[in-house]
């Protein structure tokens, strides 16, 4: 028996050594420390020798009666701390949870100007939350690619919310939010919201949200579908088109176009419904090509001082600019299209001043002379001039 047990122990020794050798790498791996961190640049990137005035938006804002705090990464929850008797307006279906005395909380469904907001495609169903004791609420959105941003309104600067669904929640007794109609943009982007007063705002954007701070004299060009909100300053944002390289080809004129336009056949053809339908189709194709192919050349120019909130993901050009605005910007010379408007206004002012100047000169005009005609007996007429100079 002793010999058998000795032989069994000798046969199991290789397995024991191999087992110890298998465990040794695991023990060595457990003793190693792996440290991973995100690299952060010390300074922002340079653009044409100047610092790009873009930074991340604020994650928290507070007032005497409330506090907004963005939680999570990438910013999936909004924590709202309310004092007693403070009202919180949040979009319907965005309330996640609430901590505090639930018996003191009152929640009602509020309709905020449903007629005007429905016409402008702005959400008008909001949940009004108030409590007689301090509470803390968590708010989120249904979309997984949105980012929160909080704005503190101190009453000195008003804001314009460019996106219809960007406003998520707000609080403040003196805060006023009024829908505004912007006819310069397309039907889907007619609705803007003007925010005035004091309070806190919670905005959401598609992708990541960034804040662009402009000083006096600085300019910033942004795509209109990327703009979430901006401060209301003068002058207002203007359409802008970048310059492009143009290769002009001069073809000698043979007068063929003028001859064809003067012919009766072309004149009669232009009055037919078929010709008008063809022109309308060509207009649609031209506008579509400008939106899809050259749509990256249509931007908005902001002049400082101003603060602009931009989002990393944007909508289509067709949802931002109307057909008329696309064609006007594309047909205008490169640069700021506001110059053409200023020239037209100046020309109109000159036309109004010319008749006024003529009317002013009428009372000052006086008779400088007088002519007297006399008929002689032979039928001849003689003129004698008399007046001031004689």
UniProtKB/Swiss-Prot annotation:
The keyword Mitochondrion applies. It holds the Pfam family AIM24. The lineage of its organism: Eukaryota, Fungi, Dikarya, Ascomycota, Pezizomycotina. Residues 348-362 have a biased composition (Basic and acidic residues). Residues 348-378 are annotated as: Disordered. Disulfide bonds: none annotated. InterPro entries: AIM24, AIM24_sf, Trp_RNA-bd_attenuator-like_dom. SUPFAM superfamilies: TRAP-like. This is Altered inheritance of mitochondria protein 24, mitochondrial. Gene3D superfamilies: Mitochondrial biogenesis AIM24. It is found in: Mitochondrion. Belongs to the AIM24 family. GO terms for cellular component: mitochondrial inner membrane. Keywords: Mitochondrion, Transit peptide. It comes from Ajellomyces dermatitidis (strain ER-3 / ATCC MYA-2586) (Blastomyces dermatitidis). GO terms for biological process: inner mitochondrial membrane organization. It comes from the Eukaryota. Residues 1-28 form a transit peptide.
């Amino acid at each position: 028996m002793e010999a058998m047990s000795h032989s069994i122990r000798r046969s199991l020794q290789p397995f024991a050594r191999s087992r110890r050798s298998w465990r040794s790498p695991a023990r060595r791996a457990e003793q190693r420390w792996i440290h991973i961190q995100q690299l952060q640049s010390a300074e922002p990137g340079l653009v044409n020798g100047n610092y790009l005035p873009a930074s991340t938006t604020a994650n928290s804002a507070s007032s005497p009666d409330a506090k907004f705090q963005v939680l999570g990464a990438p910013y999936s929850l909004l924590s709202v701390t309310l004092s007693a008797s403070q009202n919180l307006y949040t979009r319907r279906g965005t309330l996640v949870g609430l901590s505090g005395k639930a018996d003191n909380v009152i929640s009602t469904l509020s309709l905020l100007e449903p007629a005007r907001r429905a016409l402008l495609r702005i959400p008008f169903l909001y949940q009004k939350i108030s409590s007689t004791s301090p509470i803390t609420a968590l708010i989120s959105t249904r979309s997984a690619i949105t980012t929160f941003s909080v704005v503190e309104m101190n009453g000195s600067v008003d804001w314009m919310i460019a996106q219809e669904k960007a406003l998520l929640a707000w609080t403040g007794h003196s805060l006023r939010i009024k829908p505004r109609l912007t006819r310069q943009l397309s039907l889907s982007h007619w609705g803007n919201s003007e925010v005035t007063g004091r309070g806190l705002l919670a905005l959401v954007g598609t992708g990541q949200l960034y804040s662009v701070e402009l000083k006096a004299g600085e300019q910033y060009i942004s795509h209109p579908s990327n703009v979430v909100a901006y401060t209301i300053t003068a002058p207002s944002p203007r359409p802008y088109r970048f310059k492009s390289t143009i290769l002009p080809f001069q073809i000698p004129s043979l007068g063929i176009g003028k001859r064809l336009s003067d012919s009766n056949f072309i004149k009669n053809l232009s009055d037919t419904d078929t010709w008008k339908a063809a022109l309308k189709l060509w207009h649609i194709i031209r506008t579509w090509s400008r939106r899809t192919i050259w749509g990256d050349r249509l931007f908005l120019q902001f002049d400082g001082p101003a603060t602009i909130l931009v989002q990393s993901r944007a909508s289509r050009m067709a949802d931002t600019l109307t057909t008329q605005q696309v064609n006007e910007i594309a047909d205008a010379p490169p640069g700021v299209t506001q110059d053409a408007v200023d020239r037209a206004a100046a020309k109109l002012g000159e036309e109004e001043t010319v008749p006024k100047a003529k009317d002013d000169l009428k009372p000052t005009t006086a008779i400088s002379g007088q002519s007297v005609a006399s008929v002689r007996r032979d039928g001849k007429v003689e003129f004698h001039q008399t007046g001031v100079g004689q």
